[in-house]
Each structure stands twice: as structure tokens, then as C-alpha cells.
Amino acid sequence: MNNFRITIVAFLAVLVFTTTVTNSLDEPNMDTISKSREYKCKIDLDCSNHIACRHCSYRNCKCDHGTCKCMP
């Protein structure tokens, strides 16, 4: 019975470890000065759900040199 408990504890520890590592790999880079997440767009479609474009319409949000901006 003691081996079963050790097996369960080891399994849970490995599960928590792999989940933590996987989540940390998915996060974008952090800017060290402002501690904000660095986001670089490549095409206009990358900006469709970005917070910088929430106040402008979908077609007016453009990727301008890696930054999502509302265009007039």
C-alpha cells in the first residue's frame, strides 16, 4: 500500500511539473523594463484580437513595423 501512495505522489509531481513547463514555454517574451508582454505582429491579421485594436474597427487595425495600430 505504501508503494501505491509513492507512485501516486510521483505521478502528480511529474504532471504538475510538465504542466508548469509547458505553460511557461507558451507565454510571450516579457519586457524587463515595463514588465509588459512584448507582442510583435507580422501581418494585419495578427492584430485582429490584440488589445491595441479593441477601440478601432477590424479593417482599420494594421501591423505597422511589428506594432498593431489603428489607421485612419
UniProtKB/Swiss-Prot annotation:
Keyword Ligase attributed: no
First-listed, main subcellular location of the protein, grouped into a coarse class: secreted
N-terminal signal peptide: 1-24
Origin: domain of life: Eukaryota
Disulfide bonds: 41-63, 47-68, 53-70
GO BP term, example: defense response to fungus
Subcellular localization: Secreted
The entry's keywords: Antimicrobial, Disulfide bond, Fungicide, Plant defense, Secreted, Signal
GO cellular component labels: extracellular region
Keyword Disulfide bond carried by entry: yes
Family designation: Belongs to the DEFL family.
Name the record gives this protein: Defensin-like protein 286
Phylogenetic classification of the source organism: Eukaryota, Viridiplantae, Streptophyta, Embryophyta, Tracheophyta
